[in-house]
């Protein structure tokens, strides 16, 4: 039998915390009100606000006319963010003690936080604050900033809107209107995550409103590509309102997309690009995930559930996945999706890889190298896919500055033996000196061209020589190092051999010269 000690410890702690929580039944009925207030103050000093509230409740129940007890309970409510209950207590204080400045001051601050400028101004006046006091000045500045933010939004001046709204929110931190206004302007600027942060504040201020849930969920899921948090937010919407049709619809839609997305990811990781491509783009019988998401995003933007200017990261991911699937399966429409992937995201790895290949094929070697190096930098974990193509580009660039035997014969780099032989015969028929004259090709030009054709065929028809050429080593290059020079001379001394072969009827005349002394054979 195995015991989960960690689990037991957590359970025990939770049990003890519950058991030790103070309840009204724990307070002796005969404890004097003064003692109750002392106990409440002691708990407050320890940061135990909930326990303090239990004692304040008991004290007020026994003496509901004590305005100071109500005032202290109101401040305790404030510290917990329970503003509606605090406001109620402050109003009770004023009904018992009209003109109590402390209550007016607290109500002024509460109205200011809510962005209720006129009510806050009135309460500051009742609290005895002069028109030139710091509180009045701050309030007027915040009120003006809120007005300027509204005007900037209407004029499409998004940065000004965000700046002015921020100034107002310093004072009116619990104003739903200002938070929603700044969220809107931030969305227009493309600051999606900051805008969502503002909407999270709105949720706390308007707990019964499902609209922020929908915007946060849809924007997180589609615009940010954060599937987990997007679904998590719409679940909170259903917890807030289990009967919400719009929340149910969005939850079902997002779950379906997430399931298909993960399935396609698995297909690509298992090397099934053709299957993945069909799932992404669709077939005659089934719509694909890409068109489905396009349609969903269009509808969500129309309903203002996603900001109209937001980038759609989920769609960018899907387009790049399609580029990958079509590239790996050599699909004829790979260029279409890879080009779109780069338009949506200039740092698309698969888009860059496809572009680099296309540039290499078009003999844009410098551009291909730059593109492929960028791809390798973006995804260091994918270097095994980039490096072989990058090496080809470097070799092709080097070859382009010397001889290109493939180009001489007019064949592709991956041509097989049959294609090479066929190209050789075709070129020979055109440029053979005996036949070139009939086609108007000068004899000297034909001989020169035929020599190049023979040289190219000699290399490409020999697997070993061709392999060397493909690695960037031209077998006919005059720049290759002499194995008998320098340190490579097996006899030392740094003196080269001289090899001469003479013609003539007397047979070869071969001489080797070593160290300045000839040896004749």
From Swiss-Prot:
UniProt feature, compositional bias: Low complexity: 509-521
Loss of function: phenotype: Shows increased sensitivity to the N-glycosylation inhibitor tunicamycin and leads to a significant attenuation of the virulence on tomato plants. Accumulates significantly less fungal biomass in infected plants and leads to significant decrease in secretion of PG1, the major endopolygalacturonase produced during the infection of tomato plants.
Broad class of the protein's primary localization: endoplasmic reticulum
TPR repeats: 33-66, 67-100, 102-134, 176-209, 211-244, 315-348, 349-382
Record's keyword annotation contains Isomerase: no
Any one GO biological process: protein folding in endoplasmic reticulum
Domain J intervals: 404-473
An annotated GO cellular component: endoplasmic reticulum lumen
Signal peptide start-end: 1-21
Compartment(s) where it occurs, according to its Swiss-Prot or TrEMBL record: Endoplasmic reticulum lumen
Annotated spans, Disordered: 464-521
Name recorded for this polypeptide: Tetratricopeptide repeat and J domain-containing co-chaperone DNJ1
């Amino acid at each position: 039998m195995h015991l989960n000690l960690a689990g037991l410890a957590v359970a025990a702690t939770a049990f003890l915390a519950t058991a030790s929580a103070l309840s009204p039944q724990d307070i002796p009925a005969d404890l004097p009100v003064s003692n109750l207030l002392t106990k409440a103050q002691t708990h407050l000093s320890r940061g135990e606000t909930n326990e303090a509230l239990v004692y304040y409740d008991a004290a007020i129940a026994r003496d509901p006319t004590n305005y100071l007890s109500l005032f202290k309970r109101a401040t305790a409510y404030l510290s917990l963010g329970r503003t509606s209950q605090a406001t109620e207590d402050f109003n009770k204080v004023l009904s018992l003690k009209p003109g109590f400045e402390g209550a007016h001051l607290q109500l002024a601050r509460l109205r200011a936080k809510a962005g209720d400028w006129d009510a806050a101004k009135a309460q500051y006046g009742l609290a005895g604050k002069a028109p030139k006091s710091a509180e009045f000045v701050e309030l007027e500045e915040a009120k003006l900033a809120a007005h300027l933010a509204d005007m900037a939004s209407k004029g499409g001046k998004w940065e000004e809107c965000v700046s002015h709204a921020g100034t107002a929110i310093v004072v009116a931190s619990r104003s739903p209107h200002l938070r929603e206004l700044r969220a809107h302007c931030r969305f227009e600027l493309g600051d999606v995550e900051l805008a969502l942060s503002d909407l999270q504040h709105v949720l706390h201020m308007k707990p019964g409103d499902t609209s922020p849930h929908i915007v946060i969920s849809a924007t997180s899921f589609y615009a940010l590509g954060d599937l987990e948090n997007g679904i998590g937010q719409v679940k909170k919407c259903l917890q807030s309102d289990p009967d919400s049709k719009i929340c149910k619809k969005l939850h079902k839609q997002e779950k379906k997309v997430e399931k298909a997305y993960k399935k396609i990811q698995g297909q690509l990781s298992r090397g099934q690009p053709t299957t993945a491509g069909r799932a992404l783009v669709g077939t005659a019988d089934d719509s694909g995930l890409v068109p489905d998401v396009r349609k969903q995003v269009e509808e969500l933007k129309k309903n203002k559930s996603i900001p109209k200017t937001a980038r759609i990261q989920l769609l960018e991911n899907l387009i790049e996945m399609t580029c990958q699937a079509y590239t790996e399966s050599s699909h004829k429409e790979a260029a279409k999706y890879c080009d779109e992937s780069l338009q949506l995201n200039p740092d698309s790895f698969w888009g860059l890889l496809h572009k680099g290949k296309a540039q290499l094929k078009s003999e844009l070697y410098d551009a291909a190298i730059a593109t492929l190096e960028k791809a390798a930098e973006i995804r260091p974990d994918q270097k095994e896919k980039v490096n072989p193509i990058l090496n080809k580009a470097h070799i092709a660039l080097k070859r382009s500055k010397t001889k290109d035997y493939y180009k001489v014969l007019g064949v592709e780099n991956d041509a097989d033996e049959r294609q090479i032989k066929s190209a050789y015969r075709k070129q020979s028929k055109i440029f053979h000196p005996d036949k070139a004259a009939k086609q108007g090709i000068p004899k000297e030009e034909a001989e020169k061209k035929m020599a190049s054709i023979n040289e190219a065929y000699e290399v490409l028809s020999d697997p070993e020589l061709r392999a060397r050429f493909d690695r960037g080593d031209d077998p006919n290059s005059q720049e290759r190092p002499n194995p008998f020079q320098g340190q490579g001379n097996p006899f030392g001394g740094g003196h080269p051999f001289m090899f001469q072969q003479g013609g003539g009827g007397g047979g070869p005349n071969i001489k080797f010269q070593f160290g300045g002394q000839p040896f004749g054979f």
